[in-house]
Amino acid sequence: MLGLKFLVLLSILWGRVFRLTNTQHSWTAPKDEDASLTPNHASASVSEILSLQVLSATQNPSTQGPAAAERSSEDDVLLQSTSQPSETSTPPEGRHQTPLEKTGTAVVSLPLSLQDKPSIKPSTGAGTVMLANATLKFLQSFSRKSDQQEVSTKSAGDMGNRSARETHLRRSDNSRNQRPSYQKPSFETTRGKNWCAHVHTKLSPTVILDTGSHLPSGRGSCGWYSSGLCSRRSQKTSNAVYRMQHKIVTSLEWRCCPGYIGPNCQLKVEEQQQLAHSNQAESHTAVDQGRAQQQKQDCGDPAMIQKLAEQLSQQERKLSLLQKKVDNASLVADDMRNAYLSLEGKVGEDNSRQFQSFLKALKSKSIEDLLKNIVKEQFKVFQDDMQETTAQIFKTVSSLSEDLESTRQAVLQVNQSFVSSTAQKDFAFMQENQPTWKDITDLKNSIMNIRQEMALTCEKPVKELEAKQAHLEGALRQEHSQIVLYHQSLNETLSKMQEAHIQLLSVLQVSGTENVATEESLNSNVTKYISVLQETASKQGLMLLQMLSDLHVQESKISNLTILLEMEKESARGECEEMLSKCRHDFKFQLKDTEENLHVLNQTLSEVIFPMDIKVDKMSEQLNDLTYDMEILQPLLEQRSSLQHQVIHKPKEATVTRRELQNLIGAINQLNVLTKELTKRHNLLRNEVQSRGEAFERRISEHALETEDGLNKTMTVINNAIDFVQDNYVLKETLSAMTYNPKVCECNQNMDNILTFVSEFQHLNDSIQTLVNNKEKYNFILQIAKALTAIPKDEKLNQLNFQNIYQLFNETTSQVNKCQQNMSHLEENMLSVTKTAKEFETRLQGIESKVTKTLIPYYISFKKGGILSNERDVDLQLKVLNTRFKALEAKSIHLSVSFSLLNKTVRELSMACRNASTGTCGQNALIPRWTKGSLPGSQSSQKSLTELVESIVEIKTQAALSNLTWNVDRLLSDTLANIVKPQKQIKLQKKPNTLKKTVNMTTILIGRTQRNTDTIIHPVAQEHSSCSSFPCQNGGTCISGRSNFICACRHPFMGDTCTVKIKEDDAVAPDFSKGSYRYAPMVAFFVSHTHGMTAPGPILFNDLSVNYGASYNPRTGKFRIPYLGVYIFKYTIESFSAHISGFFVVDGVDKLRFESENADNEIHCDRVLTGDALFELNYGQEVWLRLVKGTIPIKYPPVTTFSGYLLYRT
C-alpha cells in the first residue's frame, strides 16, 4: 500500500511541475491591445510576459471560501492562457457562453461536461454506497480539467476552423474600424518626392498551442466494491503541447530623403543648386547617406533604437531555447499522465479508506509553493546566464564589424594614395632623360627594399600560424575534457537511478504482505518506470556514441587537411619551378638581344677606332719627319738664291712632295668622316636606350593601373561578402534547433583566418604607402601585383606556401644583385671608352693644328727652293718609324685584351639579367594566388558566425536543464521520507466515473500582421525536405532555412506547400494601409561594360559594382531571379556604329528591342541608347541583354551599364 501511495505522489508531483512549466510559457494578450500595437512593439519583453503569467498563476484564490478555493486550481490558470483573451467583452455569436464564477482573481470557471455519463453496473448483492465530499471534490478536480479544455476548444472553434490568415484579417478589420475617418485605407500616399521609404525587417516569435490525445490500453476501472470481471472501456485524454515559431515581418517607414530636413522635408540651402542630381527615391546608397544626415532629425535616439534591437534579439533567442524546453516537458508530461491514468484505474480496486486522507495531504499548498519557488529560481538563473552569454556574443560581433570597417577604410586610403601618386608623372618624365645606369641602380635599390619588406611580412604570418596550431590543440584538449566530464555526469545519473530503484524495491518488499493484487499492479508500474529509465539510458548511450563518432570525423578532417596542405605545397613548388624556368628563358632571350647590340657596338668601335689609331700614328710619324726635314732645310732657306736655282733643275721632286701632301690631307678628311660616324652611332645607341627606358616606364604605368583595378575588385568582393553576412545574420530562423553540428569546431579556424587576412591587408597598406614615396619601386611592385586578377578562383594557397615562395624570391634577388654588379663593371668600361674617345678627339684637334702650322712654311719653302736629303737622314727616319710601329702594336694588343674582358662582362651581365627576369616573372605569377586564397575564407564567415552562436546557446541550455533536473531530483528525494506515513481512513462513497469527451483542436496565436507567410510546422513528417525538390505549388516561392523550408504563397492560396485555396467568403484582399507587407529581401545589381565588343551575342558586363543577393553572374552576363516578384531594370548602351540593335531577353525570349540607325551609314557618330523595363518574374528565370548588330567601344569610366532591383514580392 505504501508503494501505491508513493507512485501516486510521484505522478501528481511530475504532472504539476510540467503543468506549471506549460502555464509559464503561454502567451496571451487582450484583444483590445492587439489592434493598437505597432510593428515596433510586437516583440515585447518575453521575460515580463512570463513573470506576469507566473504571478497570475500563483495567486491565492482563497477569499471565497473553501469550495471556491478548491475549484480555482492550476488547471484554471492553464484555461486562462489558452482561452480567448477577453474577460469583459460579450462572447460572439455561435460560441458557447459560460457563466462566470466569483473568485478572488476573477478567473473564468466552466461547468463540468456531463454529456456522456456512462455508469458501471456493480455485481448483484453489492450495496449502494455514497462517496464522501472530499472524494467528490478530488474527482471533480480531474474531470474539470478535461471539461475546461473542451470548452476552451469550443470557444476557439471558429478560429480553429479558419486559417491563420483569416484570423489575422479579422483582427486587422477590427483595428481598422477603430481608426479615424480621415485616414486613407490604401497603400498610396500623398507625400511628395522628398519622402523616402525605409524598410525594417525583423523576426517575430509566436507561441502555438496544440493538443495531443492519448488512448491507454488495458482493463478499465471497476466500482469501489464491485466483484467479478469488469467491462472493457477506453478513455481518451488530451494534453497541451506548446511550440514556438518565428515569423519574418517587414515594416515600411517614411523618412526624409537625403538633402531634405525638417518636419515637412524641405530642401537644404546648400543643395539648392544640386536639385537636378538628387532625385533618387529608394536607392540603397541614398538610404545609407540619408541615415547619416537624418540622425539629428529623427524622433528616436539612435542609441536607444540600437539598444532595443539588441534586447529584441536576446528575447528571441530566449524564446527559441524555451521552445525546446517546453517540447521536452510536454513529452515527459505525457508519460507521467499515462502513468496517472493507469493508477486511476487501480484506485477502483482498492477498498481501503487510507487513500482519501493521503490524497488530501497531497493537495496541500506548501508543496505547490515549494515547486513554484524552485522553478522560479531556476528560470532566473537561466535568464541571467543567457543575458551574459548574448552580451558576450554581441560584443564579439561588434568588434569583428569594427575590424572589417577599419580594413575598408584602409583600402580606401590606399586608393586615395594611388590617385595622389598620379601627380608625380612630371617627375617621372624628368627621370626618363637620365642615363640608363641610374635607372638600373634605382631598380637594384627597389629590389633590396622589396626583399626586406617581404621578409618582415613573412615573419608575422608564420608566428600567427604557430599560434593558431597551439590554439587548435588547446581546443581539442578542452573537447576531450568535456567528454570526460559528460561520462562522469552520466555515471552519477546511473548511480542515482540505481539507488532510487533499490529504495523502490525495499518499499515494495515492506508492503508486499498486504495484498497480492496490489503487489502485481505495483510490480507492473515499477517495470514500466524501469523500462522508461532504461530507454533514457539507451538514448544517452546513443548520444555518447554519436559524440564519439563526431570526434572521429573531426580527427579525419584534420588529417585530410594536413594531406591537402602537403599536396598544395608540392603543387605550388612545381608551379614556382615552372614559372622560374619560363622567366629564365625569357630573360636569356632578352640578354641575347643585348649581347647582339653590344657585339655590333664592339664591331663598330673596332672598325673605327683601330684604323683611326693607325692613321694617327702615321700622321704623327709624317709630321715628325716633316719637322725633321724642316729643321734640315732651315739653313737652306737662308740661301734663297742657290735654292731657287736647284728647284728649277729639280721640278720632279716638288710634284712628288705635293702628291704626298694631298694624300695626307685626304687621310685627315677621311679620319674626320669616321669620327663623325662614330659620334652618330653613339647618339643612336643612347636614343635606343632612352626609348627602351620609356617603354619600360610605360609598361610599369599600365601594370599599375591594372593592379589598381584588381585591388578595387578584390575589396568590392570582400565588402559584398561582409554585407552579405551582416544582412543575413538577422534572417536566421532556426537558432532554436539544438541538433549537433559537426562543423562547429571549424568556427575558430575560420575566424582566425579572417583575422589573419585583416592583419595581412594592414601590412599590405603599409607597404603600398611606402611604395608611393618611391616612384620606381611603386611601379615595379604594381607590375608584380598585376597578376592578382589573372589566377583562377579554384586555386588555393595556404600560409605555408609563402615560405617556399620567399626562399625562391631570395635566391632570385641574390642573382639580381650579381647581375647588378656585372652591370656596374660594364658601366665603368663604358665610361673608360668615352674617356678614350674624348682623348682621341683632343689629339686629332692637336694634330690638325700642328699640320696647319707645318704646312704654312712648307708651302712657302716649296715656292723658294727644293729639299735636300741624304742617306743618313733616311736611316734615322726608318728607325723612328719602326719604334712607332712597335708602340702601335703594343697598344692594339692592350685594346684587344680590354675588349675581350668587356665581352666577357657583357655575357655575365646577360646571364644575370635573365635569371632576374625569371625570378620576377615567377613572383608575378605566384603573388596573386595569395590574395585569391583568402576569398573562400571570407565567404564562409556567415556559417562560422552562426555556428558559434548556436554552440554557445547549446552549452548554456544544457547547463540550465541539468540544474533543473538536479533540483527536481533533490526535491523528490527529500519529500520521499516525509510523505510515506499512515493516513486516516475516510468513508468512500460510490459514484460512477464520467467519460471525458475531448476534441483535438489547434489554437494558433498570431502576434503580428503577416502576409501569406504564416505557416504552421506540425510534427508530422513532411514530404519535402528542401527547396531543391520545388515543393511550393500555385506560383509560391520557396525560402530555404537550415533544417526546413517555408513557402511564400500567392493570394488566395495557403498551406505548407500552397495547395489549399481559401474560400471566396474568406479570400479577403491584403491591406497595405499600415505599411506592413510580406518579407522583401534586398535584391539589386549594377554592372558596367569597360571592354570592347565587336561580335554579336550576350553583353558580358565585366565591372560588377553592386550585387545584393548574388544573383548576377558576370561570366554569363545573366541575372537569375531569386524570388517571385516585380522587378525594375534599366540599361544604357554606347556605340560608335552607324547602326546598332539588340534585345532585352527573358528566358531566351526577346521581350524588348533597342535600335538606332543613322541615315548616312558612312558617317562615324557617337550614340547612347537608354531604356527601362518592369516585369513580374518567377523564381529561376534569367534576364540579359543581347547585341545583334553594332559594336560597343572601350571606355573608362564606363558609359554602358545595366541595373535592376526587386520592387516587391508577389
Curated annotation (Swiss-Prot):
| Positions of disulphide bridges | 196-257, 222-230, 256-265, 1027-1038, 1032-1047, 1049-1058
What sections of the sequence does the record tag as coiled-coil?
A: 303-338, 564-690, 809-846
> Region Disordered: what ranges?
57-102, 143-190, 276-299
Q: Which UniProt keywords apply?
A: Coiled coil, Disulfide bond, EGF-like domain, Glycoprotein, Secreted, Signal
What superkingdom heads the lineage?
Answer: Eukaryota
Q: What does this protein do?
A: Carrier protein for platelet (but not plasma) factor V/Va. Plays a role in the storage and stabilization of factor V in platelets. Upon release following platelet activation, may limit platelet and plasma factor Va-dependent thrombin generation. Ligand for integrin alpha-IIb/beta-3 and integrin alpha-V/beta-3 on activated platelets, and may function as an extracellular matrix or adhesive protein.
The name this protein goes by in its record: Multimerin-1
Q: Name the lineage.
A: Eukaryota, Metazoa, Chordata, Craniata, Vertebrata
Gene name linked to the record: Mmrn1
